[in-house]
Amino acid sequence: MNKLLKWRKTGKDKPSLSDESQIKTLFNYKRNSVLWSVVFGYGIFYIGRLTISVAKKPMMDAGILDATELGIIGALLFYTYAFGKLTNGFLADRANIAKFMSTGLGVSAIVNLLFGFTTTFWGFAILWAINGWFQSMGSAPAVVSVTQWFSSEERGTYYGIWAASHNIGEGLTFIGTATV
């Protein structure tokens, strides 16, 4: 357990650079890399959250779940997501953000795969609640990243760019579903 906790911590400090142009070039490269990683990374989180929206009608038409059961399942995701955002926000401040988000996205992907093999209401409900928890590991680290890499004067612009990740995720979900 201790190894797992150490793995998720931030890394050691890198050696200091003294060449101003090298520092500026590296800083701008890293900033842009982090920004686009959190934009597309959080967009992919949305794919794992919206899959049930695409599957609701076929599941109801097939008699697998009714509207009430789907409502309960959806509510469970949002309750665990909300509680997870509260707790994971604190954890994200102290964690290696790349590993933190990757863990959340990886487990969410596994839960989404398992969702396809479930046929009972309680199976769907438990898996979707777990998905909500791990989905909550995306937003807080993304916000922390933007806050850490951009000045207070720049943040509004870059938060606006990050906000497009919702649309990217929705677009990819519906395009992917239409393709399949």
What feature does the model see in each segment?
Residues 33-61, 65:
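Extracytoplasmic
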Residues 50, 78-86, 170-171:
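Residue-level signature of mid-helix packing/kink "hotspots" within the transmembrane helices
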Residues 55-82:
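Extracellular/periplasmic helix-loop-helix junction of adjacent transmembrane segments
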Residues 58, 89-90, 179:
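Membrane-interface helix termini in secondary transporters
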Residues 83-119:
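Conserved MFS/SLC helix-loop-helix module at the cytosolic interface between two early adjacent transmembrane helices
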Residues 120-128:
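Short hydrophobic/alpha-helical segments at membrane-entry points of transmembrane helices
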Residues 127-164:
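Cytoplasmic helix-loop-helix junction between adjacent transmembrane helices
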Residues 160-175:
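Glycine-rich segments within core transmembrane alpha-helices of 12-TM secondary carriers
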